[in-house]
């Protein structure tokens, strides 16, 4: 930018050198031996699909579906080389779907209580099995997933899968339960709304009724199906996954799921012992000891069995869906038992209420939580043009004591794609935000598959609307398919811009994995520069990261119409 004084870069170095003062520096724990983690979330059934038909509500035969086996040695090596330490395989567990697998002893699901044709991965139907869609041979689907775990480990990465303790599919049916394990609800007393050891809550005296559809919606887009009759047999009706107590949930409720009972009474009272306040500062072993010998609700035991089962199968970490809807005492019970047996397990939770962050970290023994409500929302507003970078220092200050636990991301399966018109409108505009998101804290970085090649999520898959890649239907992901290039996984069909974008991500993520400074101290220099540097404004953000051995100045320009120069001579001089 013409006429701008670039002295702020030299000031940044000077400030960094003088940052011994406790009043001026936001200190983080010195974790220099550890390095940043990078989690690559992949929607498993979409990853290897190279079919380009993309028919709304299309079947797996029409639109295609990816398989576990598509993650071959070459594909996994390319993901690892992108700068990835962990893969979160989303949609692995057997969930409700419309596709017919009765030939394999699996009951059909009712389209009236399934979102999309392929189904939501968060409406789990059988916790001890995997999605038959993902197997070349559905009869051997567990063996194929176990082989994928092994291939992933051989490429130097760890495996994360989802556990969804808050709810299950409306038509839960455990066909693969280990010996001694009973289905959810199998022993419930359905004559009462609530009982501690019931797995579900009930709407006494009322049958379940399918929601009244809105805005022209109908299951499967109106296609005829023998089970799509506007009814689903459930008597008495159960509470819905998001907590709705209506026998006829709204279309915007999580009507395809049923809420799990964790011993929380309908009036909010608890039928389990609460943790003493001082347990917020006690380690997982103390928590594990606390729960030994105590009676806990049946649902606690069921989900503990599930989590331990998958960790024994070789999974390295668990991502807990909607964790804040489950009492923190359960997380203390579960996670302390996990850490006692699998101390290296990575435990990531979806929590959106900032008032709960510290309890779920300290009492619930979570390793990481989503940093959405503050960091993601703020930086998205900046990218969209109406947020100011002035807000970011405050956001970081608010989580200073827990910043290492706050996972950063710009995309995931719930959020809009960066190039979509409702976010940035282009992948290029996301670059400054990605730099800040990846480098501002010691927390892990999450990247959603095809983010690195600028996927806009523009397809109409059926259920839901574009801007997000569908998690409900069979669909192709065009930019990702160009990277797959006929399953060569070499990026051979990418455009020049897509290749450049992927190289940007590869450089940034690998740097973050290897940088000592990114696990060291942080200080914002934004306000210092804004007060003293002509031309520096609310569209620029700057901060420093350092350890004794490595010092970084990080500056991001969010204004696509203005450019700034850096004098490396001055930088070297300092």
Spans of features found by a protein language model:
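N-terminal structural segment of carbohydrate-active enzymes
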Residues: 24-158, 166-168, 172-176, 188-189, ...
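Active-site neighborhood of glycoside hydrolase catalytic domains
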Residues: 279-355
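Hydrophobic faces of well-ordered beta-strands that scaffold small-molecule active sites
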Residues: 38-40, 87, 159-161, 318, ...
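Substrate-binding cleft/loops of secretory-pathway carbohydrate-active enzymes
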Residues: 169-170, 175-178, 331, 352-381, ...
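C-terminal motif of bacterial Sec signal peptides marking the signal peptidase cleavage site
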Residues: 17-18
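Conserved, mostly hydrophobic/aromatic
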Residues: 42, 89, 127, 162, ...
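Loop/helix patches that line or flank the sugar-binding groove of alpha-linked glycan CAZymes
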Residues: 97, 400-403, 409-412, 417-572
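Active-site region of glycoside hydrolase catalytic domains
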Residues: 169-281, 400-404, 434-446
């Amino acid at each position: 930018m013409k006429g701008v004084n670039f002295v702020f870069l030299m000031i940044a170095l000077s400030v960094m050198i003088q940052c011994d003062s406790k009043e001026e520096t936001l200190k983080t724990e010195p974790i220099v031996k550890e390095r940043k983690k990078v989690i690559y979330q992949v929607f498993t059934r979409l990853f290897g699909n190279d079919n380009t038909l993309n028919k709304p509500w299309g079947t797996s035969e029409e639109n295609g579906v990816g398989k576990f086996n598509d993650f071959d040695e070459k594909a996994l090596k390319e993901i690892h080389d992108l700068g990835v330490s962990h893969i979160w395989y989303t949609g692995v567990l057997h969930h409700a779907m419309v596709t017919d697998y009765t030939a394999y002893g699996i009951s059909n699901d009712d389209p009236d209580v399934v979102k999309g044709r392929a189904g939501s991965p968060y409406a789990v139907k059988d916790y001890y099995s995997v999605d038959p869609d993902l197997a070349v041979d559905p009869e051997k689907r567990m063996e194929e997933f176990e082989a994928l775990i092994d291939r992933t480990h051989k490429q130097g990465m760890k495996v994360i899968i989802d556990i969804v303790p808050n709810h299950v599919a409306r038509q839960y049916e455990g066909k693969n339960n280990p010996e001694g394990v009973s289905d959810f609800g199998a022993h419930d007393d359905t004559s009462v709304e609530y009982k501690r050891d019931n797995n579900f809550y009930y709407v006494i005296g009322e049958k379940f009724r399918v929601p009244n559809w809105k805005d022209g919606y109908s299951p499967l887009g109106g296609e005829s199906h023998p089970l799509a009759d506007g009814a689903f047999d459930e008597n008495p009706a159960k509470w819905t996954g998001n907590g709705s107590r209506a026998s006829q949930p709204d279309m915007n409720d999580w009507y395809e799921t049923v809420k799990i009972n964790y011993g929380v009474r309908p009036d909010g009272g608890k039928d389990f012992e609460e943790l003493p306040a001082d347990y917020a500062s006690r380690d997982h072993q103390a928590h594990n000891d606390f729960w030994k010998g105590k009676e806990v609700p049946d649902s606690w035991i069921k989900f503990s069995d599930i989590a331990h089962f998958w960790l024994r199968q070789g999974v390295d970490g668990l991502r807990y869906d909607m964790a804040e809807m489950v009492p923190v005492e359960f997380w203390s019970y579960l996670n302390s038992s996990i850490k006692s047996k699998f101390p290296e397990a990575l435990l990531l939770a979806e929590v959106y209420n900032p008032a709960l962050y510290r309890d779920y970290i300290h009492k619930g023994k979570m390793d990481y939580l989503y940093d959405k409500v503050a960091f993601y929302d703020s930086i998205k507003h900046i990218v969209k043009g109406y947020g100011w970078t002035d807000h970011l220092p405050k956001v970081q200050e608010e989580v200073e004591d827990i910043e290492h636990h706050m996972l950063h991301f710009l995309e995931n399966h719930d959020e809009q794609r960066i190039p979509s018109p409702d976010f940035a409108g282009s992948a290029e505009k996301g670059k400054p935000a990605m730099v800040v998101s990846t480098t501002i804290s010691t927390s892990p970085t999450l990247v959603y598959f095809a983010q690195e090649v600028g996927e806009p999520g523009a397809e109409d898959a059926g259920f839901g609307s574009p801007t997000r890649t569908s998690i409900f239907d069979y669909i192709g992901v065009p930019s990702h398919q160009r990277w797959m290039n006929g399953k060569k996984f070499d990026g051979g069909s990418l455009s020049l811009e897509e290749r450049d974008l992927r190289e940007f991500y590869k450089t940034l993520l690998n740097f973050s994995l290897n940088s000592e400074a990114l696990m060291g101290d942080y200080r914002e220099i934004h306000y210092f520069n804004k007060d003293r540097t002509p031309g520096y404004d609310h569209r620029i953000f700057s901060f420093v990261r350092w350890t004794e051995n490595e010092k970084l100045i990080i500056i991001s320009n969010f204004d696509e119409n203005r450019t700034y120069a850096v004098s490396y001579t001055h930088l070297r001089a300092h």
